[in-house]
Amino acid sequence: MSKNTSDLSSHTPMMQQYWRLKNQHPDQLMFYRMGDFYEIFYEDAKKAAKLLDITLTARGQSAGQSIPMCGIPYHSLEGYLVKLVKLGESVVICEQIGDPATSKGPVERQVVRIITPGTVSDEALLDERRDNLIAAVLGDERLFGLSVLDITSGNFSVLEIKGWENLLAELERINPVELLIPDDWPKDLPAEKRRGTKRRAPWDFERDSALKSLCQQFSVQDLKGFGCETLTLAIGAAGCLLGYAKETQRTALPHLRSLRHERLDDTVVLDGASRRNLELDTNLAGGRDNTLQSVVDRCQTAMGSRLLTRWLNRPLRDLTVLQARQTSITCLLDGYRFEKLQPQLKEIGDIERILARIGLRNARPRDLARLRDALGALPQLQVAMTELDTPHLQQLAVTAGTYPELAALLEKAIIDNPPAIIRDGGVLKTGYDSELDELQSLSENAGQFLIDLEAREKARTGLANLKVGYNRVHGYFIELPSKQAESAPIDYQRRQTLKGAERFITPELKAFEDKALSAKSRALAREKMLYEALLEDLISQLAPLQDTAAALAELDVLSNLAERALNLDLNCPRFVSEPCMRIVQGRHPVVEQVLTTPFVANDLSLDDDTRMLVITGPNMGGKSTYMRQTALIVLLAHIGSFVPAASCELSLVDRIFTRIGSSDDLAGGRSTFMVEMSETANILHNATERSLVLMDEVGRGTSTFDGLSLAWAAAERLAHLRAYTLFATHYFELTVLPESEPLVTNVHLNATEHNERIVFLHHVLPGPASQSYGLAVAQLAGVPNDVITRAREHLSRLETTALPHETVVASPTKATSKPAAPHQSDMFASLPHPVLDELAKLDLDGLTPRKALEMLYALQVRI
């Protein structure tokens, strides 16, 4: 592109104007308004044509070269923007602001909007059920400042995080569509691998200027009131975000009213692997089906669904908040009160995002119509909320409030079914503004005026052949036949002479003409001005309206959780101070919904006497389901929800870790085993005695001996850490752990064989499993029968020839032993060796020392 911009004087005047604007936005697609089209030029055109599947053509020449070009109709803009934003592209909208009729040279143009994935607010460009977040990060490997903004709601937060590992986990949680990092950071950092990462000038993150702009935004002298005045790095990141938002929106941001200081210590932390494994809101295939959210989300509003997603992705450790939510759900269940609220909440709609668009001054007429309907529904909702008698619900009712004056204003202003955009008018009701009514009447009723005028003039003049008409050249006129022209009244002024007729105009008709000819454009301008004024009236009340939206979203979530508790048979968990995790008849909330047979519920008990369960049993026996359901029950408890269990008693946890499943990281150059060990290392470094740890088949990605050794050592470390641990394994040798680790207990998932086929019973029972049923599972999977038969032969030989011994692997503190399990050969058993056979036959009592030494030398050579 540089070759086209090296000398602007060589370009045509229009392309000079284009390049002056384009050079300010080199990395973004520019849509350049020309008449009824947005034109796209040069490299932008080539890229856009490919992404949008539109025709690439050429437009004349400039600077001696043809100009690659493609274009789209201006009225189709939104559809194309949707495609580009979903592809992660940013688009600059350049509009004509000058009047082509009066412009000398190219019509004046300027950039009016910049659409980026993280700063879009248009309804068509957003997923209504998910937050659309943009983040900025500043710092080094030891400490990072992170700021997160949702421009579609006004939520703006900061936090500081120690180390890359925790930063990447937090980025995985919030999943921003754009991430801003300083341009002076080294290349190929972990954060830069994320899609949507953009580098910004280092001075955009400068702390002092950031502090100044943030204080100006919130109309405060300092940030002490937000509790984040000492977060130097996070303030720098927040300043960068605020500047970026203003740059893209080209307007003030009144809906950004505060800065929330978040702390990781206040939450239950889940790393990226754990979030993926538990499938909270995205399944392992990248979809939304069969996720926890798909089961627990029946919210009536989109803003309620988004809030529930935030809760699921950020479980709390604040017992006061959790118990307030539990009490609220109990109240809503009492007498099925939630059933009265939910239909009313459905009438509210997504006012959170509507208010953001009002703040950005790009709200559309239908946004205001929906806000009108929402405010109109508030009084009836308040009636339904009078029965709610918990302090938290009562506070939500007070915050929700009512807005009778604002509702009346919108009812008076906006027609029942307004058009999508204000561009062509037709939005405001008759009676809202007398001047607008007059202008619209002139424009719409000109024909009737002319009919009435003609009748009056005929009566006044007595000239029966008088006609009133209009043409584009001479405007409005009164026409008389030539023979009657001499009888025209004195106030008739001659306008045009025709063959056989004369045309006149009167002062009254002239006054009407002046009004009528400009009435339509003046009416449209007046309506747009009134619409902007209406937005300003709404902006003046934005703060309480946003509080109302937040209260209604939470009420929606709590009502939803009450409905789910009733229909999914969920019960209220009890938080206790002593360390424990006791679940009676726990169920997996997602698996239970997709099964066509009844789900087999199971108990779990972890406390000061038992901190680890070693779980054995066949593949498909339910080990992973049992582990995951425990994590989901604990997570639901920590958002204040009821849980899928007959009863649940637990203490607060600080983290949930999962090491489940196997997959490689081709992009990162890591094998399946490397991924497994990285996740294991993260757990061993960061788990505490208040963490819940799920470990599934650790060590299976390498050789038997290496894998077993690593699994054994990892289990010992977790036992010493006293973390709440569920350790599923096929290494039966690990079932001896309780003999050396008093906090470890064996359990297994049972199964049985019937008519040579395996039947999974899915019950969790005490003690280790007696069989692995590996061949039976292989048969179920469709492995050919001859392969199964041959495998049975190999298994029989291995079981009969494996070296019998009692001692397996000694722990660092104590040698352990266990009796051989039926049909399960020891993983450390080796096949017979001739040297071992001879050693077994030696008569040690009959050997002299010299003979014994000679025998050892001979045997050593043969090993």
Swiss-Prot record:
GO molecular function: ATP binding; ATP-dependent DNA damage sensor activity; damaged DNA binding; mismatched DNA binding
Keyword terms, alphabetized: ATP-binding, DNA damage, DNA repair, DNA-binding, Nucleotide-binding
Coiled coil segments of this chain: none
Pfam assignment, any one: MutS_IV
Entries under InterPro entries matching the protein: DNA_mismatch_repair_MutS (IPR005748), DNA_mismatch_repair_MutS-lik_N (IPR007695), DNA_mismatch_repair_MutS/MSH (IPR017261), DNA_mismatch_repair_MutS_C (IPR000432), DNA_mismatch_repair_MutS_clamp (IPR007861), DNA_mismatch_repair_MutS_core (IPR007696), DNA_mismatch_repair_MutS_N (IPR016151), DNA_mismatch_repair_MutS_sf (IPR036187)
A Gene Ontology BP annotation from the UniProt entry: mismatch repair
Residues noted as binding ATP in the record, renumbered to the chain: G617, P618, N619, M620, G621, G622, K623, S624
PANTHER family tied to this protein: DNA MISMATCH REPAIR PROTEIN MSH1, MITOCHONDRIAL (PTHR11361:SF34), DNA MISMATCH REPAIR PROTEIN MUTS FAMILY MEMBER (PTHR11361)
Family, per entry: Belongs to the DNA mismatch repair MutS family.
Function summary: This protein is involved in the repair of mismatches in DNA. It is possible that it carries out the mismatch recognition step. This protein has a weak ATPase activity.
Name of this protein: DNA mismatch repair protein MutS
Organism of provenance: Pseudomonas fluorescens (strain SBW25)
Gene this chain is encoded by: mutS
